[in-house]
Amino acid sequence: HLLNVLTGSIGTEGGTSPSAWNKFHPEFFDTPPSPDSWNELNWPKEYTLSHYEMSQILPHLIKDGRGDLDVYFTRVFNPVWTYPDGFSWIEMLSNKKSIGCHIALTPTWNETAFFADYVLPMGHASERHDLNSYETQAGVWIAFRQPVLREKARRDGQDIKFTHEVNPGEVWEEDEFWIELSWRIDNEGDLGIRKHFMSPYRKGKKINIDEYYQYIFEQTKGLSETAKKEGLSALEYMRKYGAYLVDPEVYVKNKSNLDNDEMVGTTIKNNGQIEKEGAVIGIEVDGNNFSGFPTPSKRQEIYSQTVVDFGYPEHATPGYRIKSHVHLDEMDKSKNECVLLPNFRLPTHIHSRSANAKWLTEIAHKNPIWIHTKDAKRLGVFDGDLLKITTEIGWFVD
């Protein structure tokens, strides 16, 4: 990336672009406030540079006495099978003091669902609503996934309130499930939850699934105008076509000018940063007020103050100085210490979520030990050998 910065090829034709430029970001009818506290079971202090929540070590955090969970939803998630330390998950999910109530939202019966208090069938792609948008090109597009049988029933003239009325096996549509659950939890409206699920079209009424997506599509740039040319609403257009190209070309967005309304109430600092209500919204360059890049400073950042603030000043600039605790230099070959990769993912195993798909299992029905040829030669190991692997937490035979 630094090379692209130095050659001026960020956001240009033939260059690279920030992913945020080419992915659609919907505007919702309501945005609840963010949590007012830090959840150390999701984001432990030891892993301040992690990009995602550290769910793989959740059982160990709870076992260490850092907290417990009253209610835990596992959504299309099978850690007992997928994660390396599945038995720790079994221990946690079996302990009422660790997990008060475990609900498994899953399209298939699996190892984790076995330890759930409630197993709620989750719809596959053709049984639920969803929005899709990926950075596939220098443009922005949005796609609409919708339950097949619900849309067929609508076209057949049926009045469907909930998707589970027509879904196979009465499977609930996920968006509808969360709306209904949230609404019923705050039955009297005194918990401050219901107000975030009010219809933007029917005052005081609960939002329904059609209104949920109708609002998003009506706020999508150019979609209503395109739909109107065919005598359709934005929602009807997306039901019919399933996709819409929001912007065919997205280049040099960092040079987009802030308009007069955006500049009202701003101050320009000596370093060129344009601030409004305490936030940096753009950058002033040679008298031009640009929106800049999607970074805290609105510039390309080589130095990260965030990393410094989290206590890692040695990593504030780009480099390759992070040495893992499982680096080869840390291994004692005399004790047969190796880098352990207990599981891996073949294409046919689909995120390790398809253990009970017998046809895929027949295609790839082995989970062999992968070992470097040099280590295999040193240990006298050959293809087809049955080995016992021992670690600090147990052993397995494969």
Per-segment meaning from a language model:
Residues H1, K205-N356:
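Long, low-complexity segments enriched in small/aliphatic residues
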Residues H1-K63:
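Acidic catalytic cores of enzymes that act on phosphate-bearing nucleotides/polynucleotides
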Residues T12, P18-S19, L69, V246, ...:
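Short, electropositive, low-hydrophobicity segments enriched in small/polar residues
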Residues P18-H25, P32, E127, N288-N289, ...:
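Residue-level detector of alpha-helical segments with a strong bias toward transmembrane helices
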Residues A20, E40-Q214, G292, V339, ...:
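Non-catalytic alpha/beta scaffold blocks inside enzyme catalytic domains
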Residues K23, N132, P313:
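Short Asp/Glu-rich motifs
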